[in-house]
Amino acid sequence: MKVFLDTNVWLSATIFSGLCEELVLQCAQQECLFSSDLVRTEAHEVLLRKFPQVPNACDLFDAAWQAAQGIPDMAEPGGDNDRRLVKAAAAMDIDLFVTGDKRMLGWGSAKRVTGVMQIVSPREAWGILFGGVVEP
């Protein structure tokens, strides 16, 4: 199964321990993790702006992000990075797009090369991927 993590999931995994961190670790171990340069760019911008008290945050992010297989970014639709990320993931036949973004979760799915890519929360992704219940 191919898994693409949205920027907010990567950020949570970088700064906080918990479910998102475990998702990154487990998906990296199973070599099913995908990402794009747009995620890295967005993550660095947010880490520098919102977490200046963590001077090595970008290095921590990069260390984890290296485990992901890269996919090409999409230039369109301009001005909507969320839609660009979903479109890029769907174009690469990703199975699960994992996000904490309520707007994106409301989309539910996206057409991909073969079938449909599910857009799910980190908790839903954990259940789908690892079949277990996660402690809150």
Across the structure, where does each feature detected by a protein language model lie?
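Residues that scaffold the ATP/ADP-binding catalytic core of kinase and kinase-like folds
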Residues: 12-14, 46, 107, 128-129
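Glycine-rich, phosphate-binding/catalytic loops in enzymes
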Residues: 20-23, 52, 113-116
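PIN-domain endoribonuclease scaffold, especially VapC-family toxins
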Residues: 24-76
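Alpha-helix capping/helix-boundary segments
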Residues: 9-10, 39, 84-85, 103-104, ...
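Short active-site oxyanion
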Residues: 30-33, 93-96, 116
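Active-site neighborhoods of divalent-metal-dependent phosphate/nucleic-acid chemistry enzymes
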Residues: 64-110
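Short, well-structured N-terminal submotif of metal-dependent ribonuclease cores
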Residues: 1-35
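Acidic, PIN/NYN-like endoribonuclease modules and their adjacent C-terminal/linker elements
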Residues: 36, 79, 102-136
